[in-house]
Every structure is written in C-alpha cells, then in structure tokens.
C-alpha cells in the first residue's frame, strides 16, 4: 500500500521506517528541511536503537522517501498524523500542529484510486479531538481512524513492529467504520497475523486509551517514589518492598523502581493535559489526584539535592559534582524534562563545578550554549576529581562502573544512586558512602 506519514519527529520517523519495513511504499512529510535531508539519506535525526538500520535499508530499497511538500502525499491510501502536541502555558495540549497538519493535507486528499482514503491519527490528543477532525476530513470524502501509538523510547522499533495491542477508534456509522477497519487491517496485516490483539472502539475511547495509560504509569511511578520517602524515614528498603508487592499479580513489578522521577516528552505533559481537558469537560475533580502524582515527581529531585548537601555540606562550596546521565531514560538522547538535567541545573548554583556525561545525549548537550554545567566527553573524564557522583540515568555503562576504579579518579567517595541501579554492597566495599532512593 501507498502510505504517508505527516510529521517525522520521534513518532513519525519510527512509524514511517517501520511501515516501509512491512513492505509498504511510504512517504514522510515534515517542514524541517534539515530533518528531511537526514532522513532521505537514511540517517536518524535522534538516537533510537535499530532505527538507523531500518531507515537506511528501506531508503536504499526505494520503499521510503521524505519530502517537505504536502503534495507528496497524493495517491497514498492512508495518511498518518504523527505531529507533536506539546504542553501550552495553561497545561493543556497545544493542538496547533495537528490542526495545521490536517488543513495542509486536505487539498491533497481524494487522489487515491486503490480504495477508501483514510486519515489515521497517532498523535496524543485531548478526548474529543477526533470527532471534531472527522467532520472536516469526511467533508472531502476521506475517513478518519484514531490509532494511538504506545511506543517506549529505546524500544520504539520493537514496539511498532511487535506491539502488545492495536487500537482503532472508528466512526459511529457501521458502514463507514467497516470500510475504515478494512483499510487499517490491510496496513497492519503482517502484524495482526502474528496474533496481536486488535481492539475496535469509538473515537473518544481510543483517545482515552493512550492518555489514561500514561496517567496510570505516571501514578505507579509516583506511588513507589512516595513509598521511597517513607522507607527513608522508617529505615526500610524500597527495592525489597517493590519486589514483594510486585509479585502480587494484581500489581505487577514493572514501573516499580524508585528513582528521581519520570521525565520525557510524554508523561509529564500528558497528565497535565488530561487534567486540563477534564476541567473543560466539567469533571476536573475526577483526575485531581494527578496533581499529586506530578508533585511527588517533582519532589524527588529536591530530595537528592538535600542528600547532596547532607553529604558535602549545606552550601556545597568548593564541591565538584558529577551527574551521570542527561537523557530522561537510557537508550535515548531525548533530554525533554530530564530529571538528571534538572538536578545538574539546580546544583550548578551552590556547587563549584557540575560535570555531566551521557553516552548519547552528551554530544548534543555539548553544543548548547549558556548551560550552567560542563559536559564531559567520557565517563572517566567526568569522574576525575569529583566529590560526588549522582546517577541520573540508568545507562548500562554506569551500572557496570567498577567502584574501585572510580574511587581512583574521584577526590572523595560519595555516590547518590538516583536510579537504584548500582550494586550498593560493591560500592560500599570499595569505600564509597552510598545513598540510594529509599535504600542505603
């Protein structure tokens, strides 16, 4: 099938490459010339495992092209909307990119002769968006499906090609819904053939699936982080606690690792947008607990700063602090709402020096001007002469650090394990004063 993908950022680039890998003829459209040039050359504009190989293979095979012009979508049967919905000043989702994408594609629809033409929304949007857009799209004879994404950065290619479920939000009219479903089933034929569950529902429910999933994950993370504060006060171990409660099949163990909080371009934004939309619908009290989820998340950074002051002295005067990690999670170079960088920025005021290292995000960070911290080219150089190590992102290379070798580089042996990913006993045995999140 001929497909188009509107917006070639993180979501769109991965989706375009993955659909081409399934054998479709795909064109990606983006207004960013530099991004289009990179993608057209088979290069990824950001770090994501497996993506660059996928891009190069399908660009070389001629199945995947990129353009700045919306006219390039003409003739495609399915058009995926994959643009961002960033947080506005009010906390609500900024829908301007989605609206512009739809307005820009409208003149180029109804050029497909292969069958019904479908616009498939993948962007995370406030509930009610699809119904509004459907009125516009159906006026030109196309159909709208809401097909939310469930990608994890660092596993995005895997999650696209081998998803744990497929969701279609379809029109109310049974005949229209049947035609749209048939087209989407053809797009995902190879994925569905593996047994991936396909869930069919109305527009509003499909929109809520994505936003409520993110709200639930954020709640689970903040729950275990709140428990870590209780563990600190009571002398308990949050890692052992999480293991025990995670064995309850009603709870499960995933997302129960205490740390310095969640970040990225999804969870913080989405829980605030969810609250804002609920307020607009007159049910703001229903998800009001998400404000507390947000608050707990923010307080985790403050707790690390306080621990740093307890270890090095209240004013941190003369101290060098090393923050290991800049991306909000490992296997990514995404620094949006990064807890590690929040810490680096906050500590840059009182500390003499703050040095940051990240194996993927570091080179990008080094090019940024007016940052209050240094960026080290290697883990070793980041540790030289440090007084305190803070693990802010659980990259494998940080987990594999030899504490004895690290001690030979540091000036004093203090470590705050902001992701509870180090072997505490090994670090203590090497002479380090170790502090974890909810464990010692």
Language model features with spans:
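Structural/interface elements that position substrates and couple domains in central-metabolism enzymes
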Residues: 1-440
């Amino acid at each position: 099938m001929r497909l188009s993908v509107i917006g070639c950022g993180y979501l769109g680039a991965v989706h375009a490459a993955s659909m081409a890998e399934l054998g479709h003829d795909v064109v990606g459209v983006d207004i960013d010339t530099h991004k289009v040039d990179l993608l057209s050359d088979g290069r990824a504009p950001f770090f994501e495992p497996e993506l660059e190989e996928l891009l190069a293979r399908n660009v070389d095979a001629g199945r995947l092209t990129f353009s700045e012009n919306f006219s390039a979508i003409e003739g495609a049967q399915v058009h995926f909307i994959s643009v961002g919905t960033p947080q506005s000043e009010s906390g609500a989702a900024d829908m301007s990119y989605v609206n512009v994408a739809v307005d820009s594609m409208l003149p180029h629809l109804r050029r497909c002769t292969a069958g019904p033409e479908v616009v498939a929304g993948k962007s995370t949007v406030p509930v009610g968006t699809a119904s509004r857009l459907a009125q516009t799209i159906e006026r030109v004879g196309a159909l709208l499906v809401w097909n939310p994404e469930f990608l994890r950065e660092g596993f995005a290619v895997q999650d696209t090609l081998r998803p744990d479920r497929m969701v279609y939000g379809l029109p109310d009219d049974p005949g229209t819904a049947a035609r749209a479903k048939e087209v989407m089933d053809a797009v995902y034929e190879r994925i569905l053939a593996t047994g991936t569950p396909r869930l069919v529902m109305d527009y509003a429910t499909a929109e809520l699936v994505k936003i409520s999933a993110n709200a639930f994950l954020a709640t689970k993370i903040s729950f275990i982080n709140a428990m870590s504060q209780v563990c600190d006060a009571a002398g308990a171990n949050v890692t052992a606690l999480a293991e025990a409660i995670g064995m309850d099949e009603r709870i499960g163990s995933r997302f129960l690792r205490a740390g310095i909080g969640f970040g990225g371009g999804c969870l913080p934004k989405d829980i605030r947008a969810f609250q804002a939309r609920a307020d607009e619908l007159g049910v703001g009290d229903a998800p009001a607990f998400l404000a507390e989820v947000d608050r707990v998340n923010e307080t985790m950074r403050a707790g690390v700063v306080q621990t740093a002051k307890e270890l090095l002295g209240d004013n941190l005067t003369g101290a060098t602090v090393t923050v290991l990690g800049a991306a909000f999670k490992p296997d990514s170079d995404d620094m949006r709402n990064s807890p590690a960088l929040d810490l680096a920025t906050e500590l840059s005021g009182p500390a003499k020096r703050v040095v940051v290292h990240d194996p993927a995000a570091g080179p990008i960070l080094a090019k940024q001007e007016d940052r209050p911290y240094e960026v080290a080219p290697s883990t070793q150089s980041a540790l030289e002469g440090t007084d305190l190590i803070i693990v802010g992102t659980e990259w494998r290379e940080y987990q594999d650090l030899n504490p004895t070798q690290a001690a030979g580089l540091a000036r004093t042996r203090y470590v705050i394990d902001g992701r509870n990913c180090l072997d505490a006993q090994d670090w203590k045995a090497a002479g380090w004063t170790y502090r974890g999140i909810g464990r010692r």
